[in-house]
């Protein structure tokens, strides 16, 4: 089993994980699954944070596509979605309540692509339950603290200065 740590899709993933070439990584995942067709799998570890929310839909679609392409006799593509707890200013709980609708739409997409009758090319019940658990935590612990917002702003301003990146270009919706 190989583990792939990625928290978003495309340029957003590259921003979060400085130095990542997202397309190269996905090509390598595909090649690994092609070249070693038996007794292996890939697990995506998605550390769910406030920068993950707006592109998780594309990442879920990518995971489902990999399942369709590579899971013929057993599940070869997995994912886990633990919540980021620290730093507090990067938790999903800092986001406005309106972002929960994005998360809910992802849960609905997963439900539409679940069900044992569809074989291996589905989202499992326990994966949907993890997403529901994350939503429940978010609702219970929503915390738009002014200090956390200041820390978020300060961190990513410094991040952009040091790494020559641009938060507003990569995350215009935020």
Regions found by a protein language model. Name each.
Residues 48-54, 72-105, 116-119, 124-135:
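Flexible glycine/acidic-rich beta-alpha junction loops that bind and position SAM and/or redox cofactors
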Residues 1-84:
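Radical SAM/AdoMet-radical enzyme domain recognition
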Residues 104, 111-174:
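Radical SAM enzyme core and accessory elements
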């Amino acid at each position: 089993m190989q583990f792939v740590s990625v928290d978003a899709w495309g340029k957003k993933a590259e921003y979060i994980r400085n130095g990542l070439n997202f397309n190269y990584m996905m090509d390598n995942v595909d090649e690994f699954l092609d070249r070693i067709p038996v007794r292996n799998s890939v697990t995506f570890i998605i550390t769910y944070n406030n920068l993950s929310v707006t592109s998780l839909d594309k990442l879920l679609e990518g995971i489902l596509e990999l399942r369709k392409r590579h899971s013929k006799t057993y599940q070869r593509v997995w994912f886990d979605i633990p919540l980021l707890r620290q730093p507090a200013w990067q938790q999903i709980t800092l986001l406005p309540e309106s972002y929960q609708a994005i998360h809910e739409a992802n849960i609905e997409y997963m439900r539409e692509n679940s069900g044992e009758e569809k074989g291996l090319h589905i989202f499992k019940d326990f994966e949907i339950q993890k997403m529901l658990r994350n939503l429940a935590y978010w609702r219970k612990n929503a915390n738009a603290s002014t200090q956390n917002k200041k820390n978020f702003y300060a961190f990513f301003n410094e991040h952009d200065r040091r790494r020559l990146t641009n938060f507003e270009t990569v995350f215009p919706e935020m």
